[in-house]
């Protein structure tokens, strides 16, 4: 008997939870992404290729640091200098982002 009363409650709550999650996620590409940035950033926004807190042009992440020395010499020597650029397109077009993530691209 209790099972029958739980089903309608679940059928009511699941769409609410999904819509709340969807409301917190934005996803747009091309001109729509530019329009979202213009709305979120009235004082302008940073380059599409740079976000606060990411690596600079000459910075790198050493992806070989976790490997043993016997493994690392087999790897391509250039693989340790992999620049990890993440822009607004990566954050809000290829996957969804929150409004606060979108605001991180705004000029101060």
UniProtKB/Swiss-Prot annotation:
Major subcellular site: secreted
Cystine residue pairs: 29-93, 41-106, 92-97
Keyword flag Repeat: no
One GO process term, biological-process aspect: female mating behavior
Tissue: Expressed at a high level in seven cells of each larval brain hemisphere that may correspond to neurosecretory cells. Expressed at a moderate level in the larval gut.
InterPro entries given in the database record: Insulin-like, Insulin-like_sf, Insulin_CS, Insulin_family
Key words, A-Z: Cleavage on pair of basic residues, Disulfide bond, Secreted, Signal
GO MF terms, alphabetically ordered: hormone activity; insulin receptor binding; receptor ligand activity
Cellular component annotations (GO), alphabetically ordered: extracellular region; extracellular space
Domain of life: Eukaryota
Cellular localization per UniProt: Secreted
Record-linked SMART domains: IlGF
Propeptide: 53-81
Entry-linked PANTHER family: INSULIN-LIKE PEPTIDE 1-RELATED (PTHR13647:SF4), INSULIN-LIKE PEPTIDE 2-RELATED (PTHR13647)
Family stated for the protein in its record: Belongs to the insulin family.
Oligomeric and partner information: Heterodimer of a B chain and an A chain linked by two disulfide bonds.
Protein name, entry field: Insulin-like peptide 5
Species per Swiss-Prot/TrEMBL record: Drosophila melanogaster
């Amino acid at each position: 008997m209790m099972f029958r009363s739980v089903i309608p409650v679940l059928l009511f709550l699941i769409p609410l939870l999904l819509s709340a999650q969807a409301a917190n996620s934005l996803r747009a590409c091309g001109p729509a992404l530019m329009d979202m940035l213009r709305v979120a950033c009235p004082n302008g926004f940073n380059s599409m290729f740079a976000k606060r807190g990411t690596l600079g042009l000459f910075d790198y992440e050493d992806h070989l640091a976790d490997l043993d020395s016997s493994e690392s010499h087999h790897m391509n020597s250039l693989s340790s200098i992999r620049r990890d650029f993440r822009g607004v397109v990566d954050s809000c077009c290829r996957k969804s982002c929150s409004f606060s993530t979108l605001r991180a691209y705004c000029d101060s």
